[in-house]
Amino acid sequence: MKILVAVAVIFFISTQLSAEEIGANDDFNYWSDWSDSDQIKEEMPEPFEHLLQRIARRPKPQQFFGLMGKRDADSSIEKQVALLKALYGHGQLSHKRHKTDSFVGLMGKRALNSVAYERSVMQDYERRRK
């Protein structure tokens, strides 16, 4: 055991001495030469730059499919305004379903309006007690 400790100590001392010898040479001083003003910035080659731009480009919104399914690619502001007018009685009734104040998700039905939700919870509680 004492022999292993002695070998380890000799190894560490020899590495320390060799590191000091290398550190004394100025030829191996890499970090002092890293200034941007002295180096010429190389432009990326055109195909490589084009490839990076394609990778970094954001996908179009039509490419996303969420939990609610695929969205219409041609939905526009005018269609949304017409739908809102139809829902609130300012136009003809649309063929799309009516939006209500509740949301049916994976965790069950939830109200978007907190006051209405609290009222419905209290009504459900009263019905269960009877």
UniProtKB/Swiss-Prot annotation:
UniProt keyword list: Amidation, Cleavage on pair of basic residues, Neuropeptide, Neurotransmitter, Secreted, Signal
Q: Name one GO molecular function term.
A: substance P receptor binding
Q: Where in the cell is it found?
A: Secreted
Task: Give the propeptide segment as residue ranges.
Answer: 20-56
Q: Which GO terms describe its biological process?
A: cellular response to nerve growth factor stimulus; chemical synaptic transmission; inflammatory response; neuropeptide signaling pathway; positive regulation of cytosolic calcium ion concentration; response to pain; sensory perception of pain; tachykinin receptor signaling pathway
Site-annotated residues for Cleavage: 59-60, 63-67
What Pfam families would the database entry show?
A: Tachykinin
GO CC annotation:
axon; extracellular region; extracellular space; neuronal cell body; synapse
Where's it mainly located?
secreted
Residues modified as Methionine amide are 68, 107
Which residues belong to the signal peptide in this entry? 1-19
Source domain of life is: Eukaryota
Secreted keyword on record: yes
The task this protein performs is described as: Tachykinins are active peptides which excite neurons, evoke behavioral responses, are potent vasodilators and secretagogues, and contract (directly or indirectly) many smooth muscles.
Q: Which family does it belong to?
A: Belongs to the tachykinin family.
The protein, known as: Protachykinin-1
Organism from which the protein derives: Bos taurus (Bovine)
Gene that encodes the chain: TAC1
